[in-house]
Amino acid sequence: MKFHILLLLLVGACLPVFTQEIKPKPELLPADEAPKDPEAVFSEGEPFELTDALDTPKNGSVPVPEPEPKPEPEPEPEPKPEPEPSPTPEPEPAIKFDNIESEDYGDVAETAASTQPDELNTEVIEQLVDTFLNTGSIASNKTNKGPVFANPVAQALVNSSNYWKTDNLQAPGSIKDEEKLRSWLAGYEAEAIKVLREVALSGWRYFNDASPSLKLALDEAENVLTMFVRSTSMQAKQFDMASVTDEKVMRQLGYVSFEGMSALAPSRFADYSQAQAALNRDSKDSTICDKDVPPPCALQKIDMDSIFRNEKDASRLQHLWVSYVTAIAKSKPSYNNIITISNEGAKLNGFANGGAMWRSAFDMSSKVHKAEFDLNKQIDKIYSTIQPFYQLLHAYMRRQLAGIYSNPVGLSKDGPIPAHLFGSLDGGDWSAHYEQTKPFEEESETPEAMLSAFNTQNYTTKKMFVTAYRYFKSAGFPHLPKSYWTSSIFARVWSKDMICHPAAALDMRAPNDFRVKACAQLGEPDFEQAHSLLVQTYYQYLYKDQSLLFREQASPVITDAIANAFAHLSTNPHYLYSQKLVPSEHLDIKDSVIINKLYKESLESFTKLPFTIAADNWRYELFDGTVPKNKLNDRWWEIRNKYEGVRSPQPYNTSNLDALIHNSVSQVHSPATRTLISYVLKFQILKALCPEGTILSEGCILSEDTTEKLRETMKLGSSITWLKALEMISGKGELDAQPLLEYYEPLINWLRNTNEIDQVVVGWDGEGTPFTVEEIPKTRQPGDGGNGLPSEDRVAFPGGECVNGQECLLDSHCNGTICVCNDGLYTLEIGNTFNCVPGNPADSGFGDGKGGLVIGLFNNEVTTPEPSAEPEPTAKTTTKMPPRVRAATSPFSLYLTVLLIIYFAL
């Protein structure tokens, strides 16, 4: 009721102001008729007396003496206007995109299609209606004469040629005629492309409309492919590889004859699949109880991520970690079974054990060829190169964890870190602690600037890809077919159940049919992803003229490295400025922003590298059989401590298998060092693409000349090894971690200096000395950072205190003491609240009375404010909150005072 009465009174107060008559100003006398001395109009010694009768003698007309003429003053020369300072010219963009030829991206057809309703698959409905109309029932009366397939096109390929037959095969290696081999390979290519095309189409349909029927169709297509691979591999083994003289023909034969785990007998392959399914099921469905919570237990692995990311009670995290590894210990027999069956499959492919078969993807060994280099030695060399950097990062984080978790039991200043303290269940990603441990407060403003540019320039997700495409064309890459733009999916279609993750660049196994599947959103992350996916598409497009068996990447590690290098290049400030996505102010990046960026990336990616080495070395020992069955868990932690400086949160439990907590061990049965190798290659390729002297952490601008070697390498596809591809791109055909260290150099220097100043112990082979109270750093509170909103005590509003680092909101910033409005805004004070507004309503008569409603309006750009009784802040400021400027008293402001009295009296 008070509010409604106040509102009515306020409206009543405003009406007289806005409806009053505007009176014309009195006309001024000419300059030569105006009296020079206003007091001369009155007689000396006879004061002017105000009366009601204007014709009284006292107020009678008084003669005014004629003024003496004065000489006309010489006209003053007109002042010359001050020349306006010329604006600072904007820097020239590094890339002239106006010179890039525009193309038809299918936007017209896309716009027309967007106005139509989504297509519906009415085939099933029509069949049911026809059946009902003809029979009066929806039950079919047809007699099934054979199996009904979800993918009849794929099924029709089975046994459609001799390449599906495995009867009457000759003995392995018995055919030594190379011409027969060439003829067989030509026929193989013609048959294989049909199968691969159907698998690609089935996958595309399912990923973009994940219905049960389309999933069944994809499964059938993949089963057909498995049958084809098995039969052709058996046929290929008839040829003697040692008799082949042509290196390319030999490489093709090697690709076809390799079966992998498909070489197992069907029953044994089924055992392998069942063991995998059991691992997946146990990992997902195992339940545990929270600390001090009695059964029934309901927490699953999916619930752990948020708990470990936000919980700061180390004892609770230890309880959850120990409970979960104990719960999944039942998977230990299944994992041992996978190791055994993997060894069997490796021997069928000509390898000593599963570890040797895994390494063959990198060392190029085969049944008839020895490894080209010792992969384990190369990995150890990489580790010795990056170990000093990792130890600096490890030491810095270890000290910070003492502050975050209040010096928890088991954490020392010179020993390994307990695995449950990294902010995730498996401890693989340290980035959960970024906000509380980052070196500096300043963050890059590029993401916000880019998002603003996207919105201002009416970007769509497709336009992000078009923008990236124009960048590639400026760097010498060729035109892509129009079908790429008309067939690809760049954004999620919400009327369908799409498989969005992961985004993928797809070779559809048909001439000029290349597509991308991405549920992209406007923003910096997906802008980077657009460049990553496009360079993968270009890899596929450039090797399209190779024979089918060479129409692949040289290695997945090469593709990953190239894709990640281009994602980084897309963040170069000069490139973004050329694309009109950031203003020129972003061309100069502060060192603090660069160090923060590198620190965050190191927590997300670099810290995983030692783990990949530990995980693979442990599994290689399992494949070799060198570790006793009752020592598997002990050995796991010994290796992790050696490479990572990480220890178990509890004493070793021989009945457990703690490694199964990691998806990269329990779910992915392939070398984890693929991550390490591709990450190292990323920086080798980045350094090769950029000019000499480039600061790798900032990237560079590419040109047609700098990408020439890369494009030539891509054209060769898998006809060359990944080491040869690396040599063609970088000039060096071996792994080298020095470019990685060069990239992280600003962060490495900062970590080294910070650890020295804080006297932090580097390494983890100490005696387990605990932190003293003085050594524990003061970290930000849990609500300070993270990816969510800051807590209430970490924000302040205009006029509020910000002395403790609070974030100023609502168009204000901290002047060291309080939050003041940004330049160009006005401060509107209503009661004890301040608001930053763009206009100046003071012209309407608002003032700052003494009542409960106080309205003061003043421009933050005032340079000569009136004196104020309030003391000025002593802290150094850039923009002061100006003192109140008292407005002239008006009937309206008096009415507001009366209004306030009435309001509080109600």
Swiss-Prot record:
Residues 28-95, 862-882 are annotated as: Disordered. Belongs to the peptidase M2 family. Expressed in the hypodermis, in the vulva during organogenesis, and in the ray papillae of the male tail. Residues 863-882 have a biased composition (Low complexity). Glycans are attached at residues 159, 653. Residues 67-83 have a biased composition (Basic and acidic residues). Residues 175-765 form the Peptidase M2 domain. Inactive as a metallopeptidase, due to a lack of active site residues. Required for larval molting, male tail development, and formation of adult alae. Acts in the heterochronic pathway and plays a role in the developmental timing of postembryonic hypodermal seam cell division and adult alae production. Acts synergistically with apl-1 in let-7 regulated postembryonic cell division events. Might act downstream of the heterochronic protein lin-41. CDD domains: M2_ACE. The keyword Glycoprotein applies. Disruption phenotype: RNAi-mediated knockdown results in the extension of mean and maximum lifespan of 21% and 18%, respectively, and increased resistance to oxidative stress caused by paraquat. RNAi-mediated knockdown in a daf-16 mutant background shortens mean and maximum lifespan by 3% and 2%, respectively. RNAi-mediated knockdown in a let-7 mutant background partially suppresses the retarded and supernumerary hypodermal seam cell divisions, retarded alae production and postembryonic lethality. Residues 1-19 form the signal peptide. GO terms for biological process: ecdysis, collagen and cuticulin-based cuticle; nematode male tail tip morphogenesis; plasma membrane fusion. This is Inactive angiotensin-converting enzyme-related protein. The keyword Glycoprotein applies. GO terms for cellular component: membrane. Disulfide bonds join 289-297. Keywords: Developmental protein, Disulfide bond, Glycoprotein, Signal.
